[in-house]
Amino acid sequence: MCADLLPPATVRGMEQLDRDAFAKTVRVPHLIIPEATNLNSAARALKQYLLKMEHYKPIRSEERKITLHPIPVKQWEDLPVEPLKELGIEKDCLVWEEIKLSYENYKYDLILKAVLPENQEGLSAFSKIGHIIHLNLKNHLMPYRRLIGEVLMDKVADCRTVVNKSNSIQNTYRNFEMELICGVPEYEVSIKENGCTYKFNFSRVYWNPRLSTEHQKITDMLEEGDLLYDLYAGVGPFTVPAAKRGCTVIANDLNPDSYSALVINCGLNKVMRNVKCYNMDAVDFIKVELRNDLLAKLADDKFQGNIHITMNLPAMAVEHLVHFPGLFSGESIELRIKPLVHVYCFAQGADDKKPIAQQKVEQWLGVEVTDMLKEITFVRNVAPNKDMMRVRNPSALGMAKKANKLKDQPKQLAKKAKNVFAVSQTKKGNLKKTKEVAAKLKKINVQDKREKVDANFKTLHAQIVAKKTPKPAPRPLPAKNKTTPDTNKMETDLTKLEMK
């Protein structure tokens, strides 16, 4: 960008918007078009050389003058000379004249770049939801927030309200806490996304237009006749397009305002016949509605579609996976169709985020999922070294089997620990086996306290070894004289460890 065409340097640091301060005069090249020359033909020949700025007309028919950009045009030879000569335009038609620029001629990004601190990050992006612009300003920009809001209202079409996210999302209903920094406090919006219409109160629900592509990706995985359980449905960005595709959708959201908007949006898009809406806590929804409906679908041989479960609450969705194992306990049911779970989470760290996301899922499911995973996908970056990820797992609801495995883990642990301590009191030749068993114990995760339990095992093991009897004579003792380790005491010690 030519420095002469930028806002004046004197506006740097402005906190209260002064539109008059952006006025300036600059000299730029013009081409005077002779009366005998067709103005439109000349404009076509000069199309790539025109000076294009906000609210500035480079072609002035009444003056028969075309304003050119000063960067590509510094002299006559910079222009397409031969085509211009054919039109009767000669070198003496090129002149330099002054023009007046003002606040109206600058786009919002140029204005903010000129005003905000030069050596710090400026306004990188914002979201537009209907007539609302939603900002997430860094601390160093807070003194300029009123100015930023006014500039955006002036420059962004149809903007009537500008808000700034005031805190991280920590409330029960996961909606934004926001500050009105410019415009009117009107938060009812109507928007379109992926061919669907949504109405909601932006101040009372969660909506992120940056997830539009992700919503479409999930919809593209669905086919007519499929079944979708949408655990945190919000206002319906998964539910509505899935229902429009011919899927049956069981949708839930805890927020009463989201639930109301969900019902309205299903009606607006004429898909209510394919959707059941619930206003429940997600855990209760999993244990009751999802469980009962899924049992009925699995028992119905007529249902042959695929089953999907969307869990788009990245701050805590993985924690709710703990309720899936054992969900079908006490039921004689064949899992003839394995539900495909799409669970979202935040992964934070400087390295590859995929292993971090997988570890979170495994932590709450209680089993390794490496062999079950379909994919782990990057969704978007939410902060430095923090990404939103989607883990797609086709076997996360092998519920009965997973439940039995988890249920038996404490017994298996006790059995292995007993063997470790018994071997520790026998011959040195068996120490190798002891180490092998101890190594296996380290892989067992009991109540997500693996490291703590392992440390306690080692401490107890060391105490037992320290108290063992002196090494027996080389000649083996008769079987009747062999000492038997006090396994009852060891099992008692182990139980205490497990209860910690």
From Swiss-Prot:
The keyword Cytoplasm applies. Signal peptide: none annotated. One of its GO terms (molecular function) is tRNA (guanine(37)-N1)-methyltransferase activity. It catalyses: guanosine(37) in tRNA + S-adenosyl-L-methionine = N(1)-methylguanosine(37) in tRNA + S-adenosyl-L-homocysteine + H(+). Keywords: Cytoplasm, Methyltransferase, Mitochondrion, Nucleus, S-adenosyl-L-methionine, Transferase, tRNA processing. GO terms for cellular component: mitochondrial matrix; nucleus. S-adenosyl-L-methionine binds at H215, D253, L254, D281, A282, N312. InterPro entries: MeTrfase_TRM5/TYW2, SAM-dependent_MTases_sf, TRM5-TYW2-like_MTfase, TRM5/TYW2-like_N, tRNA_Gua_MeTrfase_euk. GO terms for biological process: mitochondrial tRNA methylation; tRNA N1-guanine methylation. Disulfide bonds: none annotated. Specifically methylates the N1 position of guanosine-37 in various cytoplasmic and mitochondrial tRNAs. Methylation is not dependent on the nature of the nucleoside 5' of the target nucleoside. This is the first step in the biosynthesis of wybutosine (yW), a modified base adjacent to the anticodon of tRNAs and required for accurate decoding. Belongs to the class I-like SAM-binding methyltransferase superfamily. TRM5/TYW2 family. This is tRNA (guanine(37)-N(1))-methyltransferase. The lineage of its organism: Eukaryota, Metazoa, Ecdysozoa, Arthropoda, Hexapoda.
